[in-house]
Amino acid sequence: MKTLAAVATSKGEPLEMRELTLDETRSDEVRVKLVATGVCHTDAIVRDQIYPIPLPLVLGHEGAGIVEAIGDAVTSVEVGDHVVLSFPSCGVCGSCVSGHPAYCVDFGALAMGGARSDGTTAFQDEDGSNVSSHFFGQSSFATVTNVYERSVVKISKDVPLEIMGPLGCGIQTGAGAVLNVLKPEAGSSIVIFGSGAVGMSGLLAAVIANCTTIIAVDIVDSRLARAKELGATHTINSKNEDAVAKIRQITGQGANYALDTTGNAMVFAQMTKALGTLGHGALVGAAAPGTESPFDIGNLLLSGIKISMVIEGDAVPQTFIPKLISLYQKGLFPFDKLVKKYEFAEINTAFADSESGDTLKPVVVF
């Protein structure tokens, strides 16, 4: 069958709209008609080949849609179900069976291999050549796509499907890092470096956790203003003032918890300095391979500081995404305030607006 896709064809270049052939749905796959998909920073860095996957490639890993068909081995969803698409995992390795599928031993191959394990791709161009697929198990920048079952999360039909896609990655990453990993106590302090969609999701989670001091750090005043609206008690423009000194002034002895969503080496070092005794920091921002960060090992040791490296919020999507949706329905997790919708034909504008900071979470609607 045919599918319309936004295809990455050259390093750093805008995506191209192409009609592709979608192959048959395999036994462990679900064919999904996309309703919408988020645009994430990870899509941009793979488009730019910072993390190289063979081109041409259909990106997209925050899809939301309706199940059109299922493979013979699929048991978790049925035709007609509403679904959010998240990251893939094998389901049988030690990480998966212990409840940490984001650390699946096959994560790299399943999420960023560009093909199935047998080397086939789900998409073919008009000349019959292969187009890399299964990005994060889904490749959701297409009107219809084949998705690994373990990337599929069934959700209620009572919520607006158009905005649910970002729960599959960016929103899950920020909220999960706070709720699943940092687990701040009520009354504690937390500082969040970066006020993009991931950082704002962490901020919303900190509000849910009843943190009483929530500090947002960024270099864009408009994002800091939005952070204030969403629950930040303090904001710091680190371009204009010493963030670490200000954080220590606000908290007294350093923050109890910190989240770095930037992937910037210097910001990561700042995060370690901003934590107080027995503080716990988490890094979720993706950095280019080989990135190194200077930090004071002695300070970490003497202060008992703990640093966690967190992928996908250390979440089990099939349970965590419904939890976030339940919080959203109760008015406790208003992630919809981060979203701006774009038509499919505007996907490159969505990328540009995200990279400029004009839009927190672009969602492309089909």
Where are the language model's segments positioned?
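Glycine-rich beta-strand-centered segment in the early N-terminal region that forms part
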Residues: 23-37, 50-97, 102, 154-158
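N-terminal Rossmann-like NAD(P) cofactor-binding module of classical short-chain dehydrogenase/reductase
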Residues: 84, 256-259
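Glycine-rich phosphate-binding loop and adjacent beta-alpha segment
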Residues: 264-332, 366
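Cysteine-cluster motifs in flexible loop/terminal segments that predominantly coordinate metals
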Residues: 87-150
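C-terminal hydrophobic helical "lid"/dimerization subdomain
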Residues: 1, 241, 269-273, 277, ...
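Mid-domain Rossmann-like dinucleotide-binding core that forms the NAD(H)/NADP(H) cofactor-binding site
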Residues: 79, 143-144, 150-152, 156-241, ...
